[in-house]
């Protein structure tokens, strides 16, 4: 079986390393960084994106609204199914730095509050900011390390179904815990803070940014200009 990282203790699992020799792939290639930001101008998702579960083509489209990623809601029956930790159609991206800011523009058709566009930091402890199709911004937390639940912290009516959502990683306590700040804007310039939360790594990998549309079957949201700085 392959061993991840280095086999520091023979017979046990490998451990991560800061540097590793590149494999011989038959040619020389320049060192490049893994992409983070995405303008969704391609007709294929970049390799930096990972689905929470085995993906389905009906979960997203890069052609319905060119220059945007359209994510569709799944027909999930219970409240617990719609918790982000349990959501299969969650599009995620591993963190590439200990501090950074992720911002995305979201828009969706007006509705009655059954669907919402989500920007999240997902892990065993997580948080997210979402815009509902009623024009309400929500800030929610989840804890699947001890409590196995998700709850709303606060919400605010903004009167529009188009807004900018932002998550800022402001500090890392250690390799497993970090603090994040949640905010939103209706014009892309003036961001209003909704609070801060503590996040944790996932079960097998570190914390990740995540995008999703949560709600009823047939609902959708468009995401554009995903920017990480």
Where are these regions (language model features)?
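Extracellular glycan-recognition regions
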Residues: 1-229
């Amino acid at each position: 079986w392959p061993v991840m990282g280095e086999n520091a203790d023979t017979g046990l699992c490998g451990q991560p390393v800061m540097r590793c020799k590149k494999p011989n792939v038959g040619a020389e290639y320049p060192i490049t960084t893994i992409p983070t930001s995405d303008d969704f101008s391609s007709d294929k998702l970049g390799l930096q994106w990972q689905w929470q579960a085995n993906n389905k083509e009906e979960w997203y489209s890069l052609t319905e609204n060119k220059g945007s990623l359209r994510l569709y809601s799944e027909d999930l029956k219970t409240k617990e199914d719609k918790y982000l930790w349990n959501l299969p159609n969650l599009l995620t991206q591993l963190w590439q730095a200990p501090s950074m800011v992720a911002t995305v523009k979201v828009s969706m058709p007006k509705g009655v509050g059954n669907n919402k566009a989500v920007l999240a930091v997902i892990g065993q402890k997580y948080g997210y900011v979402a815009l509902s199709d009623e024009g309400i911004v929500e800030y929610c937390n989840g804890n699947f390390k001890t409590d196995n639940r998700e709850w709303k912290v606060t919400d605010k009516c903004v009167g529009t179904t188009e807004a900018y959502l932002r998550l800022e990683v402001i500090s890392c306590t250690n390799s497993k815990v970090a603090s994040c700040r949640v905010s939103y804007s209706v014009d892309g310039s003036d961001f209003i803070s909704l609070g801060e939360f503590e996040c944790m790594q996932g079960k097998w990998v570190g914390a990740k940014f995540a995008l999703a549309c949560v709600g009823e079957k047939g609902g959708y949201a468009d995401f554009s200009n995903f920017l990480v700085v």
